[in-house]
Amino acid sequence: MSTVESREVRPARERWEVALPDGRVVPWTGFQVGPAGIAPHELAHICRRLLGLGPAEAEAAAREELSPAGAARDRPGIVAYSPPMAKRMFEGALESLAAGEPAEDWPTILEARSVCLAHEGDLLIGRTAPWKEAAAGRPVVEVPDHDHFHLSHALLRLADGPADRWSRVLGPAIDRLRADPACVVRVYALDEPMRILLLWLKRVAGVDRLLVEANAPEITEKWGHKAVLHPAARAAHDLPAPPGRAPFDVLDAETELTPLYRVFGLAVPRLPGYTVVWDGEPADAVTDGGIRTTPGDPVRVPVTPGDEPLGNGRARRAEDSFAAQLVLAAQLLRGRHGVRLGCLKPVRGGTGQRIHVGVPLDDPDVLAALARQAARSGEDYLLEAHADYLRHAVTGHEFLLAPSVHVRAGALADGMALQFLNGTMWEGNVFLDESTHAAFGIARSHYARIRHAMADFVRLFEGRGLINGGVDFAIARVGGRYDDTTLVAMQDLNLSACGADYLHAFLEESRTVLGALAGTGTGISAATKVIRPASDMDLPRLRRLVDHRTPTSYARALTSVPGNWGLIAVACPDAVRAAEEVLALEARLTA
């Protein structure tokens, strides 16, 4: 089981500590919430107590009673953003602490920045100080639980407690649903804890169906990850590939083995790559049977990758299989595609963590070490050809041409977003469209191909519960048998709420604020940028330094989690100017 799922809960004290397998005890620092979680067996008990249903029955009920829907601006809804289980944000936090590195406080970040997406009159649910600052002056529900990493777990604990307590805290949300059964609840992702919570909330409110701005669970869980773009290494190995066959013919043949093609007949542009499947159960990757999250009785964290052997024979067999598949994937990339370097990444990672670039595919020692490390997480991985992205520089930044295209309220969003990247980590976006993509070095043919591929993808899932999300693309070379050919390829499916949502929301706001300019026919572009605010840089202070408006530009501080994470934005008529101004603003703030 995943680390977040295997945690036990105890009453909170003043601080938490994490006991690492090597004997070190480190403080759970840099977070405004604790590391507590709900174990799977207890989640099942809570599900039965709240709903009278087992987990499988609750999943079936959610398909009937929770309806994916886009939120309308003229109808106040409810906003409750919790870290999605599939993104493994808790696991990423543990890895950072184990390595002695600062960790991003994703629960607080998601709560605080969700306010940027709120419509007029939306009821906001959260618990942290940055969220309260962002939500000032808006209707709110403040959750009195800072122990649990996931807001959804904190809310389930509340719901499973005394009725007089949950009715007092959640009364405004229940009253809103009763007053307007068509009210839309907006969540980051409709994962299992959130499904159970919303089914319970629906029953308490007495409404027939609950509208939820999130993808249907099958969309996010079955199709919202990298593995759907690539064949499994073992399946690809069985594909005849005669020597001398043209590389693009090989790539096309392998594309027919991908889940998207096998189920829907959709061939998407992709880089050479293969999935490496974890054959064991997720629990086989965890040496310790449980993780304690009691303050003063330190949290037990799974073994640092590669430090200790796995704890049972089944796990050892799964690890051996994983390592063999990784070697096979490397051999296929070298033999069929002539590629010498690879990129190893978890198929469900969503924050740019745990990605290894420039992997030498002919080095067995490196492959073995990476296999041991990756296998510890008990999840599937992807070994893809290393992408040498085309690049374009503006003042203050060199962009990798790795644009993303998005779905909003079930429809293909305008344009595309070019990403600010720090290594493999997302740090903001610039909005590009037909009139501005060339200024960032994106050829018209590449822009058109990306938009066409995304339109096909959205059309495929029309009516299946696709409400929001984004797809990351690469405009890159991989070398080998492809020589200097530039490939345009889908690389990642983020079928849930995502960072570019804030770019699109700010762009809509900017078009209203700069309405006189837009009325002249002048286009408006925008850029968002992640910053690292000082420990005393709360949102009111950041706004005093950032917010300004002129007839041709608009800047605003969107989020601040002091000492951890912030988001600023700039809008103006020119995309390059928007990017350069947001970078200059970041530089002034951090000088």
Named regions from a protein language model:
Residues 405, 482-495:
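A short beta-strand motif that forms the metal-chelation/ATP-contact edge
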Residues 376-401, 426-485, 524-548:
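A long amphipathic alpha-helix within ATP-dependent nucleotide-binding catalytic cores
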Residues 8-15, 512-591:
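Peripheral (often C-terminal) accessory segments that flank ATP-dependent C-N-forming ligase machineries
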